[in-house]
């Protein structure tokens, strides 16, 4: 039986396919050997455990930033029993302190004129503003009288004024605590400990807050004020006061005003800071 051209082509094709398969199988085996060889070389170059420990060094602990939080222990008690317990102790001292002379931090005469701003009352005498005038003193005898006062007022845009519960919650979050003269003070500690940095008074005479009736309380405006001399670090205390006033203004729909009843601007804030610097310079000069 003779083999034709077709049969030869089939045989040749089979041989070619077999050759291709064999070559591929050979390459695969060769590739596996090379891969294993490269892996072995890589592993042989790795440092031992002692060297690795020296290179890596000790583990580092990363500090994560956490916002300050207030717990129940930070908040002042506004319950009736606490109020009643405080009143007998303070009643006598208030009468004695209100007979003193010269203003001090946390106790300054109030005389806020809201002309040019929202009209809250037909009587200008109903409104008060911290000012360095003669007034009773509530601070200790060792505390110097305030020679200069930096004032930031927050006036409510709502004709109904700031509601007591919302106002109380806002200023407590800023670290202010109810204290002397029935107004709020910001101390060094958020818990109400340490020296007074600045204070906040009601803009309506007599300038106080009644925590017993806070649920029904409202006011058209409040005033933050910082007396000089006052805190040991007045510039830092002023920045904290600005932050508290801004927070109140932003969250309760208020408008910031300076001591001239003008809109509080970045330029005004910088001017306040310059007043602090100038006061500190004069104080250093007097000590010399």
Curated annotation (Swiss-Prot):
Disulfide bonds: none annotated. One of its GO terms (cellular component) is cell division site. Residues 106-117 have a biased composition (Low complexity). Its main location: membrane. Keywords: Cell cycle, Cell division, Cell inner membrane, Cell membrane, Membrane, Transmembrane, Transmembrane helix. Coiled coil: none annotated. InterPro entries: Cell_div_ZipA, ZipA_FtsZ-bd_C, ZipA_FtsZ-bd_C_sf. It comes from the Bacteria. Residues 66-75, 83-93 have a biased composition (Basic and acidic residues). The chain crosses the membrane at residues 2-22. Residues 1 are periplasmic. Residues 23-288 are cytoplasmic. It is a single-pass type I membrane protein. Residues 66-141 are annotated as: Disordered. PANTHER family: CELL DIVISION PROTEIN ZIPA. Interacts with FtsZ via their C-terminal domains. Essential cell division protein that stabilizes the FtsZ protofilaments by cross-linking them and that serves as a cytoplasmic membrane anchor for the Z ring. Also required for the recruitment to the septal ring of downstream cell division proteins. HAMAP family: ZipA. Belongs to the ZipA family. This is Cell division protein ZipA. The gene is zipA.
């Amino acid at each position: 039986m003779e083999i034709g051209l077709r049969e030869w082509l089939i045989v040749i094709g089979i041989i070619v396919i077999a050759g291709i398969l064999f070559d591929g199988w050979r390459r695969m085996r060769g590739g596996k050997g090379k891969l294993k060889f490269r892996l072995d070389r890589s592993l042989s170059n790795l440092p031992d455990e002692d060297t690795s420990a020296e290179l890596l060094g000790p583990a580092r602990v990363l500090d994560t930033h956490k916002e300050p939080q207030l717990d129940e222990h930070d908040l002042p008690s506004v319950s009736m029993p606490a109020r009643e317990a405080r009143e007998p102790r303070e009643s006598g001292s208030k009468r004695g302190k209100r007979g003193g002379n010269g203003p001090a931090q946390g106790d300054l005469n109030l005389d806020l004129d809201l002309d040019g701003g929202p009209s809250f009352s037909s009587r200008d005498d109903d409104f008060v503003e911290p000012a360095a005038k003669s007034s009773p003193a509530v601070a200790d005898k060792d505390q110097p009288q305030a020679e200069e006062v930096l004032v930031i007022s927050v006036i409510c845009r709502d004709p109904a004024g700031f509601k007591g519960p919302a106002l109380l919650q806002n200023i407590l979050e800023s670290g202010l605590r109810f204290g002397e003269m029935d107004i709020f003070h910001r101390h060094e500690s958020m818990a109400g400990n340490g020296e007074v940095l600045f204070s906040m008074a009601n803009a309506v005479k007599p300038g106080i807050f009644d925590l017993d009736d806070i649920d029904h309380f409202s006011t058209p405006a409040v005033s933050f004020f910082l007396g000089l001399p006052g805190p040991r670090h007045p510039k830092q205390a002023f920045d904290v006061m600005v932050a508290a006033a801004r927070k109140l203004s932003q969250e309760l729909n208020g408008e910031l005003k300076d001591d001239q009843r003008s809109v509080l601007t970045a330029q005004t804030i910088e001017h306040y800071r310059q007043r602090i610097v100038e006061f500190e310079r004069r104080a250093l000069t007097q000590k010399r």
